[in-house]
Amino acid sequence: MEDFVRQCFNPMIVELAEKAMKEYGEDLKIETNKFAAICTHLEVCFMYSDFHFINEQGESIVVELDDPNALLKHRFEIIEGRDRTMAWTVVNSICNTTGAEKPKFLPDLYDYKENRFIEIGVTRREVHIYYLEKANKIKSENTHIHIFSFTGEEMATKADYTLDEESRARIKTRLFTIRQEMANRGLWDSFRQSERGEETIEEKFEITGTMRRLADQSLPPNFSCLENFRAYVDGFEPNGCIEGKLSQMSKEVNAKIEPFLKTTPRPIKLPDGPPCFQRSKFLLMDALKLSIEDPSHEGEGIPLYDAIKCMRTFFGWKEPYIVKPHEKGINSNYLLSWKQVLAELQDIENEEKIPRTKNMKKTSQLKWALGENMAPEKVDFDNCRDISDLKQYDSDEPELRSLSSWIQNEFNKACELTDSIWIELDEIGEDVAPIEYIASMRRNYFTAEVSHCRATEYIMKGVYINTALLNASCAAMDDFQLIPMISKCRTKEGRRKTNLYGFIIKGRSHLRNDTDVVNFVSMEFSLTDPRLEPHKWEKYCVLEIGDMLLRSAIGQMSRPMFLYVRTNGTSKIKMKWGMEMRRCLLQSLQQIESMIEAESSVKEKDMTKEFFENKSETWPIGESPNGVEEGSIGKVCRTLLAKSVFNSLYASPQLEGFSAESRKLLLVVQALRDNLEPGTFDLGGLYEAIEECLINDPWVLLNASWFNSFLTHALR
């Protein structure tokens, strides 16, 4: 029967039926007739809805596929086939928007023309018997019942068949075909006899007769009757299953399951060593922007034109000098590189027409900074086979680094609001179905909470830089192209604004493989004095390049302006993911949605509005040494977004490993909090796997510190 179902029905229908059976704890390998019945019912529901639309006059029309009018509003909302939570969300939404009475049981469809829920029945017995069972179960005059049989009979409430004759004939023909195909394979008799009556749990607890026989048939292997199986389940040891598996393994496997108690776990050991350093591809909280409002200059939108216009807004340039050298680099080369950028920008301004792109002269300082001719010569492996001591060159173990406070400050800053709007999500047309209406409402509420967030600025900055760098890497492979670091936003008043953070100079970029590296030098403006946290800026050479006048409450004050310069590198695959940083918005929105869904299923109505508009309610944000931190729903949105953005900015193998391994420990701790009496073996091995990922990455070290705070408060 299972093979027949998979051949006979559309794969999407089969997948939905599998999910439904899994949701109710039923095994499709055993209950094959049930599997076939669910697929049949799903197909009838879909056929009932197919091709039926409502036109602008509110009339029901039938439109065949590939018709340009197929964008009309669907007449039927399909509820059957969705998971229970989503199905109830749709039903609640329909009731809220149409005023329909909420049904006691999940119906199959909603008819927008007749404004009523529909229960579809497909029976192998007499239609009138099945109709009465359905009506008796539903006990509601507001749900319309429509029953089909495999013999071509049908029955509907008040003989109102809803659909036209031709649409119903299609359904009957399909059911008759299914019956014939089953009969040809000798499956029909078993299928016909296996139909159960419509019973509800409230009405009947005792299992007798056919149901009892079916229960006995549906047991796992090696159980003769339901009582034996019940006795086994009642005496089931939670961890016995693992011990049973271990006993079947090699005698060398010696794993004793230890109970996991509140006193069992220890904190994760963070490494000692010098403080960790900033390793993001661009400055975050320390970045400074030179901005122009309402840009309307010639060539507006061309990065080089925008950059020159932004540079002209600053008048405090001075002779640059080094204030914080890079310990291992030739710092004079970094200084000369910045002077070269200024000189070549000045040359452009003196030209009659500004070019769209600027390729830098290949000076000795840029060749050094971009690693030109520094890569070891590649030799074909076939030419080396005879060399007896051929080996990969030795590489040093990475130096262990300790957690530093700057990374927590960076994260806190990313969660804050700025005075600019960084995203405007395009409208995607008018909502037709209730689920689209809910989705749009959630998206709009979420956007309002995060559009001013600094993490959103980092997204747009990252998208721009990675897109520009990948384009230049492909279009000007041999050139040292100058790439302005630009972002665009709107002020609170709605005025457009173009911002310049600094410049990138790209090295040679013959990128054949996804992991081939392109070197670049970044030069970024900042007001942060690097001497305050020199360990953070280990990889940078910092110049003082000017003085900026800042307005404050006490009047104007002058602050030194710095330029953070470093050599860096990236690859095609990293730039590809950097270009897609907007995904962070989607990920954090989905996390918020799951919180709303949980609340909605408890209250049995969509709670989106209450969720975002109840300003007095606080939500857990995360763990700190002081305990569970709470905040408004907006703060939760921004914190989740910042976490997602930092996962992208600080992506690394260390983060992948720590996330995967610490999750295992987290699940055990959560099981303990839920009083599930978890057992573990080789807990020391798990700690080892977690701690080998804690090397020098600031974001991983911060996450490990947060995890320790969670352990402390979770196990009190």
Curated annotation (Swiss-Prot):
Residue window of motif Nuclear localization signal 2 (NLS2): 184-247
Subcellular location: Host cytoplasm; Host nucleus
Binding annotation for Mn(2+) 2: 80, 108
Motif Nuclear localization signal 1 (NLS1) mapped to chain: 124-139
InterPro entries: INFV_PA, PA/PA-X, PA/PA-X_sf
GO molecular function: endonuclease activity; metal ion binding; RNA binding
Lineage: superkingdom: Viruses
Record note on cofactor: Binds 2 manganese ions per subunit.
One GO BP annotation of this record: viral RNA genome replication
Complex formation: Influenza RNA polymerase is composed of three subunits: PB1, PB2 and PA. Interacts (via C-terminus) with PB1 (via N-terminus).
Family to which the UniProt record says this protein belongs: Belongs to the influenza viruses PA family.
Name of the protein in question: Polymerase acidic protein
Highest classification ranks of the organism: Viruses, Riboviria, Orthornavirae, Negarnaviricota, Polyploviricotina
Gene (name only): PA
